Amino acid sequence: MALENLLHPTNIKIDEYAKNATKFSFEALERGVGYTLGFALKQTMLYSIAGACVTSIKINDGKVTSLEDVIPCDETVADIILNVKSLPVTLAEGVETGTITFELSGSEEEIFSEEAKLSEGLAITEEVFICSYNGGKKLKIEAKVEKGVGFRPAQDNFKDGEFLLDATFSPVVFCDFEIKDARVGRRTDLDKLELNIKTNGNVNCEEALRLAATKIQNQLRNIVDIEEINKGIFVEDPTKDINPILLKHVEELNLTARSSNCLKAVNIRLIGELVQKTENELLKAPNFGKKSLTEIKDKLSELGLSLGTLIENWPQDL
């Protein structure tokens, strides 16, 4: 079959069946294309769209150190953590971190997210119940908000007075797809793709789908078609002048699990990315300590490399 004769979806339906929840259907697609598109869009929405979320919580300036500690409200420490973690948050462009603070004192009252003090550039997009405060003793809750992409597991449960949380940065909280049969004229061997998307409200479902499709399109834009390849049109390898060691993955340094996880948390994948970081930049990474720094410096030294190295013409899209 000629490529120009492949079907494209012309029947597109959008069903916003609940708040921040939409079902999209696309038909008709060639057999197998529905699954290919559905899987790619799902994975991209869940793991490749940037967002912000609560990553750690401190209660009473770090004096509350256990989930079993007693606090002056009806909820447990675990309840408070879950409620604060569920806050849908956004950070303004150029703002990478923020802080949410609740300072409670006085009489009994129910506390909602609208009563929080927010750092500059931070916003909570929906009202969320936090706790039923019993009055009397003071209660202070501080939450750190960060930007990121995908999922980042917490390396510890509690450190330096903070409860550390698994971070899910994507504004898409659920995405799944289903493939059904479709027909066009006499052809019955076609696909209908149904995508079910739910977001936390920071972006709407249509915007999330558009972002995912655009990301996939950008990943594919440098792949030329067969005719262009036959004409001898090739994309120059941007890594041809770079030391091959720098293009290896950091896993090949055989670091301890703790050091490896710290590098993953800040999206350092290649040795070349690592050596361009300074000691101070690495020490600012979550859970990154001097022991990990020493280990990394020793491993790099064995290869004749060091931190703080400037690499000219380092490709930004490896």
From Swiss-Prot:
Coiled coil spans: none
InterPro entries linked: DNA-dir_RNA_pol_insert (IPR011262), DNA-dir_RNA_pol_RpoA/D/Rpb3 (IPR011263), DNA-dir_RpoA (IPR011773), RBP11-like (IPR036603), RNAP_asu_C (IPR011260), RNApol_insert_sf (IPR036643)
Region (Alpha N-terminal domain (alpha-NTD)): 1-227
Enzymatic class: transferase
EC id: 2.7.7.6
Subunit structure: Homodimer. The RNAP catalytic core consists of 2 alpha, 1 beta, 1 beta' and 1 omega subunit. When a sigma factor is associated with the core the holoenzyme is formed, which can initiate transcription.
Protein known as: DNA-directed RNA polymerase subunit alpha 2
